[in-house]
């Protein structure tokens, strides 16, 4: 929840979800 994954999720889900990232405020975060 605090580490930006360098990916946005405005139109598509987080591809980085594969490594534990999740969508928050239109940006993908980890932890």
Swiss-Prot record:
SUPFAM superfamilies: Cyclotides (SSF57038). It comes from the Eukaryota. InterPro entries: Cyclotide (IPR005535), Cyclotide_bracelet_CS (IPR012323), Cyclotide_sf (IPR036146). This is a cyclic peptide. Disulfide bonds join 5-21, 9-23, 14-28. There is a cross-link at residues 1-31 (Cyclopeptide (Gly-Asn)). Probably participates in a plant defense mechanism. Has anti-HIV activity. The presence of a 'disulfide through disulfide knot' structurally defines this protein as a knottin. This is Cycloviolin-A. It comes from Leonia cymosa (Sacha uba).
